[in-house]
């Protein structure tokens, strides 16, 4: 421990000395959270601890080294101490980030190590499919923490590998051709039955002008043969064409955009040929220049066997257990993963690509559980977006009317309706107030139905989410925060049970009925735009368990710094 501290102090001194010529810079962040919870359930419970307290402090210390104008080296170490540890116990040291990136001959950009990457929504994309409403106030703090922990940024996935990109410019016909390529390793070999698995691909984007863009995209998950005793290598290929055309008039902008392609997924020893399917997504776009109004309407058709795990991997695997009050009642039953847990527990989230169909909660999102790349969906969608010039009002809404392409366990098809809307009203910008005052409203509704003459095939499930958030600046940099989050779901579903290859082998009937309500409030003080202290109290009730409803009150203190 003493030697580690000496090394850190030495690096600080070296960094301070070198910052004059920007050879070495410090980047990173620090966070400390203290929490105290009081838990109770409707049943007499003499086993579960009523009170729980905990917390931690951590610092992510990164050194960005620029040995020359075209090279950057970043190494970041995390030091974390759980509260309750003494004399160094409970302290962990981890390497959080490590990469080298640069430019060769002012033409080719490269990055090796940790890369944050995405391509298109159907090939390689990190869909946020489970948080359907815009986070605000208290929930915004929670979501910022989980996004930081899992490196969620602009729908990218954090991977380990290498990436390159370069562009060619032309005087005529085509303005620019841009090439992107990447390769990452999903899992190592165990020298036994598990083969080395990689994920690679890229795209070529032709920009004819600012009015027309055409892209050719391809990704592949593949096992490297001869890296284990297993000869049954897996491969998942996805190829697509993406496009965007725009007609810019004096008062209006019209356009069309979309992506269409095919996928194949198979094992090398599979004599059936594996799974092969297609997807189509096309939409017409409109923008009114003066008002700022934007609208789109489109059609999507994702085949039942369409597989693209770089775009269908979920952030949360709903088969896992809670880490906060995992069990309760005298029988110590498992507490189901709640909707509000998705905000409350960053450890539920993953930043890895999963080669397989991940579990989801139909109450949370049954319409597009894997985002826009969800397989076995066909239908229409539309959207509306409006922002005033002063950005005092921001409104966005999306609607989906979809159905299954192929029935599950029956020839009857599910029909889906989904609508979500988010409104942000900034009083300070609207009334020209000096102090910031902001109200945010988020609403989501989903409806799933399947009709049949047979009662056991009938499905009806409805879910509603409502979030109200208020931020009021009382005095300079001191904010009052208030949040009301409500979630309700009622109905039934028939969830498929799949084997390791993703084939449906059975169905599980689910009866869903319950409500969640969280009321939260607190104070937040901004030392700077990137450093703040917040004290929050919240009250949660949940009635989804078929055995016993529960409630818990929780008090938090957050200290967050980014540098």
Per-segment meaning from a language model:
Residues 19-47, 53-57, 65, 69-75, ...:
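Transmembrane beta-strand segments of Gram-negative outer membrane beta-barrel proteins
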Residues 66-68, 105, 209, 473-475, ...:
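Residue-level recognition of beta-strand termini and adjacent short loop/turns
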Residues 1-24, 563:
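Bacterial Sec-dependent N-terminal signal peptides
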Residues 22-27, 60-75, 78-97, 101-102, 186, 190-194, 263-275, ...:
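Outer-membrane beta-barrel proteins
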Residues 31-36, 40-47, 111-205, 215-234, ...:
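Surface-exposed coil loops of outer-membrane beta-barrel proteins
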Residues 229-563:
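Exposed, low-structure sequence patches enriched in small/polar residues
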Residues 64-182, 280-281, 286-311:
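Outer membrane beta-barrel
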């Amino acid at each position: 421990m003493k030697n580690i501290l000496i090394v850190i102090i030495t690096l600080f001194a070296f960094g301070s000395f070198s910052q004059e010529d920007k050879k070495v810079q410090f980047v990173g962040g620090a966070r400390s959270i203290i929490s105290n919870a009081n838990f109770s359930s409707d049943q007499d419970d003499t086993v579960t601890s009523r009170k729980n307290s905990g917390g931690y402090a951590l610092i992510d210390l990164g050194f960005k080294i620029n040995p020359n104008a075209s090279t950057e080296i970043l190494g970041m170490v995390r030091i974390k101490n759980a509260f309750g540890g003494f004399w160094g116990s409970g302290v962990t040291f981890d390497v959080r980030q490590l990469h080298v990136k640069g430019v060769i001959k002012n033409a080719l950009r490269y990055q090796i190590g940790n890369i944050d990457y995405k391509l298109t929504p159907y090939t390689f994309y990190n869909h946020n499919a489970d948080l359907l409403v815009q986070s605000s106030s208290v929930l915004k703090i929670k979501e910022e923490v989980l996004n930081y922990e899992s490196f969620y940024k602009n729908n990218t996935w954090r991977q380990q590998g290498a990436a390159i990109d370069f562009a060619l410019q032309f005087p005529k016909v085509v303005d620019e051709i841009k090439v992107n390529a990447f390769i990452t390793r999903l899992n190592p070999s165990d020298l036994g039955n598990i083969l080395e698995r990689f994920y690679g691909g890229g795209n070529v984007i032709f920009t004819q002008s600012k009015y027309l863009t055409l892209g050719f995209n391809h990704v592949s998950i593949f096992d490297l043969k001869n890296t284990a005793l297993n000869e049954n290598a897996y491969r998942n290929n996805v190829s697509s064409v993406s496009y965007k055309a725009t007609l810019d008039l004096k008062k209006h902008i019209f356009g069309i955009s979309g992506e269409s392609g095919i996928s194949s997924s198979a094992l090398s020893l599979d004599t059936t040929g594996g799974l092969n399917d297609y997807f189509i997504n096309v939409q017409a776009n409109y923008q009114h220049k003066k008002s700022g109004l934007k609208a789109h309407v489109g059609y999507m058709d994702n085949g039942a066997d369409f597989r693209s795990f770089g775009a269908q991997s979920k952030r949360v695997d709903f088969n896992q257990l809670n880490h906060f009050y995992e069990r309760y009642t005298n029988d110590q039953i498992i507490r189901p993963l709640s909707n509000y847990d998705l905000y409350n527990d960053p450890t539920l989230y993953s930043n890895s690509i999963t080669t397989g169909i991940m579990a989801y909660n139909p109450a949370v999102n049954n319409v597009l559980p894997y985002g826009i790349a969800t397989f076995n969906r066909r239908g229409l969608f539309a959207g509306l977006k409006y922002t005033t010039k002063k950005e005092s009002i921001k409104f966005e809404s999306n609607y989906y009317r979809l159905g299954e392409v192929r029935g599950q366990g029956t020839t009857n098809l599910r029909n889906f309706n989904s609508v979500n809307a988010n409104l942000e009203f900034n009083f300070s910008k609207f009334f020209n107030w000096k102090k910031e005052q902001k109200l945010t409203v988020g609403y989501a509704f989903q409806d799933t139905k399947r009709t049949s003459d047979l009662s056991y095939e009938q499905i009806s499930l409805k879910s509603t989410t409502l979030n109200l958030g208020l931020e009021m600046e009382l005095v300079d940099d001191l904010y009052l925060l208030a949040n009301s989050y409500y979630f309700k779901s009622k109905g039934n579903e028939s969830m498929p049970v799949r084997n390791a290859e993703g084939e449906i082998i059975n169905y599980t009937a689910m009866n869903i009925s319950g409500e969640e309500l969280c009321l939260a409030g607190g104070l937040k003080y901004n030392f700077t735009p990137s450093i703040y202290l917040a004290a929050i109290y919240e009250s949660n009730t949940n009635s989804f368990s078929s055995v016993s409803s529960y409630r818990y009150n929780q008090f938090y203190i957050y200290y967050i710094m980014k540098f």
